[in-house]
Amino acid sequence: MRTVRYSRQGQLNLFVPRSGTGHINQESALSMNASPQTISGTPPKVMLLIDGKPVESSTRDWREVINPATQELLATVPFATADEIDRAVRSAHEAFEKWKRTPVGARMRIMLRYQALVREHLPRIAKTLSAEQGKTLADAEGDIFRGLEVIEHACSIGSLAQGEFLENVAGGVDTYTLRQPIGVCAGITPFNFPAMIPLWMFPMAIVCGNTFVLKPSEQDPLSTMQLVELAIEAGVPPGVLNVVHGGKEVVDALCTHELVKAVSFVGSTAVGTHVYRLASEHGKRVQSMMGAKNHAVVLPDANREHTLNALAGAGFGAAGQRCMATSVIVFVGESHQWLPDLVAKAKLLKVNAGSEPGTDVGPVISRAAKARILALLETGVAEGATLTLDGRSISVRGYEDGNFVGPTIFSDVTTEMQIYRTEIFGPVLLVMSVPTLDDAIALVNSNPYGNGVGLFTSSGAAARKFQTEIDIGQVGINIPIPVPVPYFSFTGSRGSKLGDLGPYGKQVVQFYTQTKTVTARWFDDATVNDGVNTTISLR
């Protein structure tokens, strides 16, 4: 058993070991100095955060946080009670009046401190993330870093949230707009990016002057909570950021609470559709980023080595558990001859625990996820797809109990097959072949999802044609995962998104603020009274 170090006196503690009596030992809470792990044979409990204080839930419903490579019990997480959810929302509501009047510069300085703290603790948080989610350490660091970029962008809110001004729109009349915060915002985040997705949400919401209630994934909340600890350490005031844990009941409570003004969601299509409908019916502003079936179109003139490396990395990285993972490869013309080389690349990838050096593909999040993936692979075989590379029976030495699925490739796939119509969310690539680029564009556009697509080519003309005619919100040219940097917005479309405005960039500032238009005319003593104006005109 490894040694656990404890926090210094006065530091916020969101991981608390269980004592023999079940009471909290406030002097021995896990800190940022160590990853959550078993203490004296009992797992630490994850706390709620309400009004700036760690709160032990009174619920009887606790779930286990399991290392997907080892099945080690890392912690237990509570499903918050209705009263605890209400307290968190009301804490955010009460904090809003003061926080919205906090000068923009003061909010920005908190974000500047926050980004420095996240950068300082990034390697340590990555170890926690890898342990609870299964990602390789390098990918876990990337998860955090892509979120860190959003914090950095939040430091520019002084220019991002500026309004507009036009003088003398009529005689002596000026019109200008203000961007003002909307109130309590809620965020519901998925298991596959426990750092990046929360950081898409609460830093931008808070720096815009809102307060926030976060519900992380119950499957891997530990790294998220470490990021929350750092936000409080950076100076986020009590009540401005709150955290509750749970499942559907918590989601529904946030979507229907009278004091919540906006809901941000990233996750599956089924849950995202439910969130959008329920929250919209209760008058909330909603952004819902959902499932995907991302295609990569390969032209024969593409750089062969670069393309194959990109496809293998985008298809099998993070064990395929990315909403922007490449899941379908469309070979155009003679490029279908590259399939054996793609299989060879996939065979070279090392499947192991994310903590092991040199690992390329870690485990999937849970035994249930593995069982679902394997069932879909069986369906693919039954439907007649060719199992070109079979990762179903992989065993990892030293981690025989891990939730591993090896890189898997199906060829001869058709659009009618369930494996094509369903987001598998595992290390599985489907391969299709078409004669022309026009056929490829038609194929991709006929799929209901619209998160991302890639084109691999050396032809500028082909690339321009593709980006113009493809009906997908995010396009990569010789880039397999076209997730924009935070200066631009995440613009997934069609069946992958509900709501007009996406995460981060300019769109999220619009989402987290409301526009107020002011039309003003000032008079002095010399102003001549023009009499009563009964028309709509400004004169």
Put a short name on every predicted segment.
Residues 73-80, 95-101, 187, 296-299, ...:
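Short, well-ordered beta-strand elements within core beta-sheets of diverse protein domains
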Residues 71, 107, 129, 151, ...:
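Residue-level signal for inorganic ion chemistry
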Residues 25-27, 31, 72-76, 260, ...:
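Conserved C-terminal structural/oligomerization subdomain of aldehyde/semialdehyde dehydrogenase
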Residues 163-308, 434:
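Rossmann-like NAD(P) dinucleotide-binding subdomain of oxidoreductase/dehydrogenase enzymes
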Residues 96, 100, 115-122, 126, ...:
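Structural signal for hydrophobic packing residues in well-ordered secondary-structure cores
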Residues 8, 13-15, 25-69, 392:
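Hydrophobic face of amphipathic alpha-helices that form TPR/SEL1-like repeat modules
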Residues 270-414, 437-438, 477, 526-528, ...:
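ALDH superfamily catalytic-core signature
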Residues 72-161, 172:
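Glycine-rich loop-to-alpha-helix module at the N-terminal edge of alpha/beta enzyme cores
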